[in-house]
């Protein structure tokens, strides 16, 4: 079966609500493990997931006025309760400072259900993130991407993001090489 890209009309993009907390934590865990799980020891992976992809963490993020979370509901779910993809942005970047931007936004996470990759959800969420940053007066959108993830780097480059620095990212006790990417708005 060939998956076809979804049309913008068939995607329901909305802001996350409290009822989404469990689904966001679950999708975050599943997407991270599917893409990167084999890179880490069981202990490091478990520590990272317990720190970064729990309902408690998502609840704190959802309550944070400095963060916004958008979701796209999974197509064809009659309940409308299954999230196919999500994007988290912060209104002030927490990444290491490597640019002269005065008001940078940060794209924290953009995750798609592993079975739905390639259907346009990531593109729709990326458009949303850039739109939110521009509307709020940000002068730059920044993100961190794993150095050995060329597919993600190409995806972000389509939106004008370029490498501005080499940085690191911690997964448990493991330190990953990351690339700081940014685009001026």
Which residues fall in each region the model found?
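Short histidine/acidic/glycine/proline-rich micro-motifs that form metal-
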Residues: 44-46, 147
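Active-site acidic-Proline motif in GNAT/NAT acetyltransferases
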Residues: 113-115, 119, 147-148
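Short coil/turn segments at alpha/beta junctions that flank glycine-rich nucleotide-binding fingerprints
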Residues: 119, 136-139
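Acetyl-CoA-dependent GNAT
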Residues: 15-19, 26-39, 46-115, 126-128, ...
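C-terminal "cap" of GNAT-fold acetyltransferases
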Residues: 100-105, 139-142, 146-153, 157-185
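Conserved N-terminal entry element of GNAT/NAT acetyltransferase domains
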Residues: 1-22
